[in-house]
Amino acid sequence: MVKTLQKTPKRMSSPSSSSSSSSSTSSSSIRMKKYKGVRMRSWGSWVSEIRAPNQKTRIWLGSYSTAEAAARAYDAALLCLKGSSANNLNFPEISTSLYHIINNGDNNNDMSPKSIQRVAAAAAAANTDPSSSSVSTSSPLLSSPSEDLYDVVSMSQYDQQVSLSESSSWYNCFDGDDQFMFINGVSAPYLTTSLSDDFFEEGDIRLWNFC
């Protein structure tokens, strides 16, 4: 007795289903775009921080509602630290004009960590959409990105200036546990080591607490 085998036709995926799956994959990759100096908290907020030059410590730049805002904060901080030599910026087209505002034509400005935080916060709030050329005027805090950043940088001259190149400043001033930085004997919670992620998870450090 010979058994006859019946061939079952293979199901061909429709072009519409394949195109929809590819589009969903591409949209998912867009949503998950990664920015330098930015990471996402488990509850959805985005935090930004930047490593201090030649150190294990990081400067805390704040917590933001969008990844783009946190990325702009990182760009501003990187320009404060490295000036015109800064590369690998998240938004080079925005950061070019930001560099001139921060330095005001001077490439040798040393800024304290607190001043860097202020400039980063102003850059993050300057525009809610990097691709948008207009800024909403409904909020008094967003009147003009240039004016906001100029005011922030001008205020920094009243801060205690901590040079990034002097040994008496925030270089080589770790405490015994290598967990926090101290500036002239004063604890500086906005400077953290790369091993202190638990410090951040205790709760957001509100940027304006240091103003």
Swiss-Prot record:
Residues 13-29 have a biased composition (Low complexity). Belongs to the AP2/ERF transcription factor family. ERF subfamily. GO terms for biological process: ethylene-activated signaling pathway; jasmonic acid and ethylene-dependent systemic resistance; positive regulation of DNA-templated transcription; regulation of innate immune response; regulation of pectin biosynthetic process; salicylic acid mediated signaling pathway. It is found in: Nucleus. Keywords: Activator, DNA-binding, Ethylene signaling pathway, Nucleus, Transcription, Transcription regulation. It comes from Arabidopsis thaliana (Mouse-ear cress). Residues 34-92 bind DNA. The lineage of its organism: Eukaryota, Viridiplantae, Streptophyta, Embryophyta, Tracheophyta. Probably acts as a transcriptional activator. Binds to the GCC-box pathogenesis-related promoter element. May be involved in the regulation of gene expression by stress factors and by components of stress signal transduction pathways. Residues 1-32 are annotated as: Disordered. This is Ethylene-responsive transcription factor ERF014.
